A protein has these predicted regions:
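Glycine/small-residue-rich pyrophosphate-binding loop that anchors the diphosphate of NDP-sugar donors
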Residues: 91, 116, 136, 175-178, ...
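Conserved SAM-binding loop
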Residues: 116, 139, 157-164, 192, ...
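Beta-rich strand-turn-strand
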Residues: 133-139, 190-202, 209-212
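A short acidic, glycine-rich active-site loop
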Residues: 167-179
Length: 255
């Protein structure tokens, strides 16, 4: 009798003997070691510290140097966390000072564009699983927050014509357009910003919004397609939209 047949008999519990083996396997599977809180709490923090230190060493001696080597410019105090971004196509990358970029991101340049360029301004943050596809240009201003799983789509991945798609032709160059994100913008998680859009200074894009048109400065947009749902007043010190908010009717449109 082979091992597979033996395992089948145990799972089926065919008779007293195989039922006993099954019960023994269940007991073995549920054996637990006792938890000693002081000891295991210490071991937990030791593991956590060792893991963090290992990630720190990998970041400063491996991940960041590799990523910087393919960028046109990287400013001071740049922080790359959780690995190295996946980069597709030819892409000129310019990064300012005090920028934090999550390594689990995708940065892609359109192959039909002569010089697709990505600019990330001072003090900006790019979160987890963000996708940025660059047509001619994606320009992110200063102190911009781009949350997890945001997509900035600067060009079409495929042509609209089905025959061209079947022939594996790229989308026409003319279908790529810039995306401009001005200073102090917050793009919330899972939002999508499409090609040709400008997000005005101090604006906020709500979670899951799909932005198809320009967003005025100091407004909040939500929905699909995104519409203005609130207007913000800049803070008196000019640091951003920290003042009074005015709701907008459901049918108000961008612009």
């Amino acid at each position: 009798m082979g091992l597979q047949q033996l395992a089948m008999k145990i799972r089926r519990r065919e008779g007293v003997f195989y039922n006993g083996l099954y019960q023994l396997a269940v007991r073995i599977r549920h054996i637990k070691s006792p938890t000693i809180p002081p000891l295991h709490r210490f071991l937990y923090y030791e593991w956590k510290s060792r893991r963090a230190f290992g990630h720190y060493l990998k970041r400063i001696f491996y991940n960041e140097p590799l990523f910087k080597s393919i960028c046109r410019k990287v400013g001071d105090r740049f922080c790359l966390v959780n690995g190295i971004p996946w980069i597709e196509g030819q892409l000129d990358i310019y990064i300012g000072d005090n920028v934090t970029l999550n390594g689990i991101t995708t940065l892609a340049g359109a192959t039909v564009q002569e010089k697709p360029s990505l600019y990330i301004g001072d003090g900006s943050y790019i979160g987890y699983q963000v996708t940025i596809t660059v047509g001619p240009l994606v320009k992110i201003g200063r102190n911009v927050l781009i949350a997890d799983r945001v997509s900035l789509i600067g060009y079409d991945g495929h042509p609209l014509d089905p025959v061209a798609r079947a022939n594996h032709q790229p989308a026409p160059k003319e279908e790529g357009h810039p995306i401009i994100i001005e200073d102090n913008v917050w793009v919330c998680s899972n939002a999508t910003v499409l090609k040709g859009v400008t997000l005005g200074e101090g604006s906020v894009v709500a979670t899951h919004a799909v932005v198809t048109a320009d967003v005025p400065p100091y407004t909040v947009v939500a929905g699909n397609p995104a519409r203005v749902v609130k207007r913000l007043s800049p803070s008196s010190d000019g640091a951003g939209a920290g003042g009074r908010a005015e709701p907008v009717g459901h049918h108000a449109e961008n612009g």
